[in-house]
Amino acid sequence: KLSHIDLLVVGLPVALFAVKKAALEKAMTGKHDVGDGKTVTVAKALAVAQPQGALVHYASVHQKMAEIGKEQSLIIDPGSRTFDWLVAQGMRLVQKQSHSINRGMSDVLRLIAHAITKDIGTPYRDYDAIDLALRTGKSPVIYQKAYDMSRHLALADSVAQQAVSTMREWIESPHSLQNIILV
């Protein structure tokens, strides 16, 4: 509905932030065709590391902007395809301690689907059913029967452990963190 945007804020995975920031901001600035003969003009674009917006949101919602501005924070964003973390001193990104890896929920879903495939002897790829089961604790129905996924939960845990172990290697002073925010 808007034809002009003064400032468009976009996010990048932490690992790509330094190398893609300028190119993304340039690509987002200017006139864009949005279909049906409509265009939107973006006056300025600002790329931020994906979890950085969560820090600003948290500080704003909890009315802690001034305090967090003086503290060190860790923001963890486990996504579908990437696991991002960001260390911030105040609101500023600490690039050398922030990163992302290609580990996400899609890896968990694929591993569990593969285990179910081996168990039932036929290809199983209902990732939505697996995702729902993980979120609710309710077994997915496979061949009209509730399927107990509990024996496959260690696979999900292994993906999470890999991601967290990698993150811990990057963080220099975990004892100095005042805030840990999970997106």
Indicate residue ranges for each PLM-predicted region:
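Nucleotide/phosphate-binding catalytic cleft detector across ATP-hydrolyzing
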Residues: K1-S73, R92-D107, D119, D128-V183
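Conserved catalytic-loop position in the HRD/HxD motif
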Residues: D77
